[in-house]
């Protein structure tokens, strides 16, 4: 019997212990969850925080401050192209992470590998200008880094969402808060750097080095923190393979028969008997002595099952988990999350903050306000009063997601100056940012807690599916944004 002091106890939904009531190992896992959230979006935020650098990247790549571009359409829309390449790559790659061959890869390898790829993206952006290349080479570099970032993000994001989806909901909420805090950090730094450094060729170059250096530094610290996580007893109660030992995770209703034959789906009656054989199939991770005792005392000692069997590894549970069955369980939270980010990326940042192109500070301050209230919304599920009162009231989150469509006319009218004034834009960013963080975070937290998600394999897959929902909504929203911006330019 496991007597480790950090053995997990069930927690009420949305409820987390005060930091001073936690063990050191539990608090450390919260810190790692937060750092994973920050690192997840840090590369994208670093690129978007230095738009002047990326939009004139050809000058730095050609090492010529007076260079005139030939591919004007690409450089005028370079941020959109970069974002679209990354999102489409993630949308293609992230579902592949659910395939059985990928799920056999140890969790720690996926986390560290995805993080290394994200670091490589930023290193490439910094190395190419140092070595020098042509404008075509600069275009290829932007496209390649968009692909590299999308590839690394899909691996790191799907694994992180899945892993922390198997922990109590407060860990997912903390990770989501880290995602929002990444935007706050880069926005705050952008304001400071923009005020301190000139917008000259050398000034913009220094700005990019600050943003990219911060990104690599934070992701490097996250890399080290994840390595140390394998020695954390609290984390091993959820994913033992992080420490290269047998997992103590909850196998739920996953049977030994299902684990050995993942392509077969035996049915069981209410008493846990296999309907085809009539035999009881004990759950993995439970004491397996009843069947042996029925054969006599000698059979207990000779049984191939030990008196108390260690649970399967996390990867064994994942391989035995049905994807589409899990998707049916989380479908409404999947839809709510996808539509939430569809609306957000349709309007933000292009439409929501681009209505005053001649203003030096409007877009910078508007993005900062959005990020601050977005992170407040992402942390709000840590307050129990922000949760639906019962399981049946989860429809409120779906309704809130679809209600955000009201921002489309409100922000479009402002972008066309039918509603004048910068103050209106700032107020809208407060509501828009908080609603994005709250709805997105609640959907991501509630998804792995849906009925029928009864073991950690399903919770991991549910968390991964919720991460995919962000990409689905984000891709559609980005495409709609490009179409809208194109129509605006022509008319």
UniProtKB/Swiss-Prot annotation:
Superkingdom to which the source organism belongs: Eukaryota
Glycosylated sites: 274
NCBIfam families the UniProt entry points to: 2a57 (TIGR00939)
The protein's name in its UniProt record: Nucleoside transporter 1.2
Biased composition (Basic and acidic residues): 261-273
Residues that span the membrane, as ranges: 27-47, 82-102, 109-129, 136-156, 173-193, 209-229, 333-353, 361-381, 395-415, 427-447, 460-480
Primary subcellular site in the record, as a coarse category: membrane
UniProt membrane topology term: Multi-pass membrane protein
One Pfam short name: Nucleoside_tran
Stretches for region Disordered: 261-280, 290-309
Record's subcellular location: Membrane
Misc: Can transport tubercidin, a toxic adenosine analog.
Record's function text: Sodium-independent nucleoside:H(+) symporter; transports adenosine with high affinity and uridine with moderate affinity. Can transport cytidine and thymidine.
Catalytic activity field: adenosine(in) + H(+)(in) = adenosine(out) + H(+)(out); uridine(in) + H(+)(in) = uridine(out) + H(+)(out)
Origin organism lineage: Eukaryota, Discoba, Euglenozoa, Kinetoplastea, Metakinetoplastina
Organism in which the protein naturally occurs: Leishmania donovani
GO MF annotations, alphabetized: nucleoside transmembrane transporter activity
GO cellular component, one term: plasma membrane
Family under the similarity heading: Belongs to the SLC29A/ENT transporter (TC 2.A.57) family.
Keywords, alphabetical: Glycoprotein, Membrane, Transmembrane, Transmembrane helix, Transport
